[in-house]
Amino acid sequence: MKRLGIGTAAVAGTAVLADCRNSGGNRMQDEPPVGKMTFRENPATHDRVSLLGYGMMRLPTVGQGEAEAGKRQKGDETIDQDMVNRQVDYALSHGVNYFDTAPVYCKGLSERATGTALKRHKRSSYFLATKMSNMHAFTREASTAMFNNSLKELQTTYIDYYLLHIIGGSDEEHEPMELFQARFIDNGILDFLLQKRKEGVIRNLGFSFHGDQNVFDHTLSMHDAGKVHWDFVQIEMNYLDWSHAHEINEANVNASYLYGELQKRGIPAVIMEPLLGGRLANLPAPVVAKLKQRAPERSVASWAFRYCGSHKGVLTALSGMTFMEHLKDNLRSFCPLEPLSDREKVWLEGPLAREIMSYRTIPCNDCKYCMPCPYGLDIPGTFVHYNHIVMEGHLTDNLKDPQYKKYRREYLVSYDRAVPKVRQADHCIGCGHCLPLCPQQIMIPDEMHRISSFVDKLKANS
């Protein structure tokens, strides 16, 4: 299996919280300083954008409390607006001014929550980013309605940074290039958005990329030919994906290529997945020890953020900060940024990345685009649990392993606690409904069946 996993919200959240609280040294325990945020300038508009951007994809929920590793939280559907307001206020007061949302985030509720929180502040004090998330219904009428609804939900008359969402993917009826044409070209939506930019309703127009390199290259060729000027582009980048994204998943493109192509054209890069959905904050103990040996006072997550921030072509690096502890720790990494040395970059991209690659997990970032499953399965919850056990080093099917009985019981008991039995992997019928919805292009039915077979084997070896 040639797949490497991405930590998930519940598991990664716990890891980050533990890391924030247990780090040695006063730097990680003090409140982040005010007035020290590092900013990057948009070369076209001269916007001063905070190097840390707030990703509004995993907002705090009512009753969520402190996440417990490997467990799904109750009350996931209800966003805790009071906590969102508090965290947005804290972020703004510490210099964060870029807020990234989308119509599909938080099961359609993120834009409203984001708009509610930001409406209480002066509009010129922040930059709003949202997206044309017309993955399911991409007629002109449905797409323009989505755009207008974003303005309504965000309670604004203009969008600072607007993106074509998830270009490069495919669906049951379209190959990647065909889907790009259907979603944005044939229906006239790109022309519509270009007109909105002329009118000032959109201030900067770009796209976010997942998937087929040919589509990425095609969109940049449009820029080169003068057909469309892309003001910015959002890509996945971190010290693991820099050279290993394609090895992790053959559908992915190495970040070094994506970033390099943008640099050639002077297009600012907005970074998503700097932590691989939390994966680079939830590292195995041997890897953590190596990071702590070099900088005991720094959190594990700070290495990943400093890596992204050390690239001069990065406009902002997005982080989905569910908990206040996440926000505070990330602020310490950017207030101000202390760039990595060239030697540290090489170490992260090379030896450390290769060690992380040896932990073979599933590349799920818990985005929940695959949900709801028509048969009621908790797909991301199943992957969350599996990845957590892998990262703990407790996954084994070797009967001769002296820890086998302990690890076997741990997996089965924690699986039943994390995911209700009726929603577990053994109920997957392989319908494929989820396949075109996954931006990571995971073969979800295959992975569900693999986990189901593994669990059956554990149960048989009682």
Locations of regions flagged by a protein language model:
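N-terminal binding-site loop/beta-alpha segment at the start of enzyme catalytic domains
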Residues: 2-126, 157, 192, 198
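Beta/alpha (TIM)-barrel catalytic core signal, keyed to glycine-rich beta->alpha loops juxtaposed to Asp/Glu
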Residues: 34-36, 167-384, 391-409, 436, ...
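Conserved, mostly hydrophobic/aromatic
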Residues: 42, 54, 91, 99, ...
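Active-site mouth loops of central-metabolism enzymes
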Residues: 58-81, 131-141, 211, 288-295
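Short, acidic/polar
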Residues: 75-91, 139-154, 212-222, 300-305
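A short, structured active-site edge motif that brings together acidic residues
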Residues: 124-136, 162-165, 235-237
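CE4/NodB-like, metal-dependent polysaccharide N-deacetylase domain
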Residues: 143-162, 195-199
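Short Fe-S-cluster ligation motifs
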Residues: 392-431, 460-462
